[in-house]
Amino acid sequence: MKNTPPLRKFLLLPFAVLACAAWAQTPPSAEPAPVVETPAGPPLPALPAMAWEPPPLQPFSATYQAFYKGKEAGDATMQVTHTGGNQWRVDMQVVGRRGFASVLGLNLEQSTVFDVRNGVYAPLSQSTVRKGLFLGKKAVGTYNWETGTAQWTGDVKKDRAKPIPLQPGDQSALLLNLSLMRDARPGVAMHYRYVELGKVRQHDYQAAAQTENVEVGDLSYNALKVYRTNGGNNETILWIANGVPTPVRILQREDGEDRVDLRLIEYQGV
């Protein structure tokens, strides 16, 4: 199986999204866990709300194939690591391997360190690194819950380097993806405040009333569709499957046309 990433814009998706996603690398383990693959088969029956089970927070590594405007663009990897106690880390790396992105050598990395407080994911720090032939930028942010502010340093605009007042439940882009995985239920509306790189945005999502059969490459998933409702002409759609710790597909559309499309091709426990 392979994995593929979108371009810079995907880093601001909640799993966006994605996306997300931007996604990360991990030190190799002595014995890698077995890869989980779902064999293709006949369409799976839709699940009622009572049968839906959101995936628990657990360590994993996932590989995505990414398309940009319908053309293969590169690779994306996402990893969640338990660093001890209530603290976790989520990483994403996107590498451009096709077309213009390959020529420029685009390499995007994001990470968020967070802890779990009464079931809520609270970001502690966040970093974004963008590399390329004519590009090299890094920004690091700290979410200080004692002072109630978040602030970024590095390659950020002056007006985005000021402290931002925090509110309970505030999320980074990568953390928002995990929160959607935790909170999504058939028919449920979800509301989050996104705070990252000196910006604050409201993100509202709606889950479909029931699951649907989704084909991702050679695999078939019984997945719940979750979509953003306040993005205007920028649509973000995720499909979440029972038993899979990460979205099986993330699609971003602009003005009715597909822009970034991430398709899960492999995942494994860490």
Q: What function would you assign to each model-found segment?
A:
Residues 10, 150-151, 248, 252:
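Short, hydrophobic/proline-enriched secondary-structure or compact coil segments at domain edges
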Residues 19-24:
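N-terminal signal peptide c-region/cleavage motif recognized by signal peptidases
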Residues 132-173:
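Hydrophobic, well-structured mid-protein blocks that either form specific transmembrane helices
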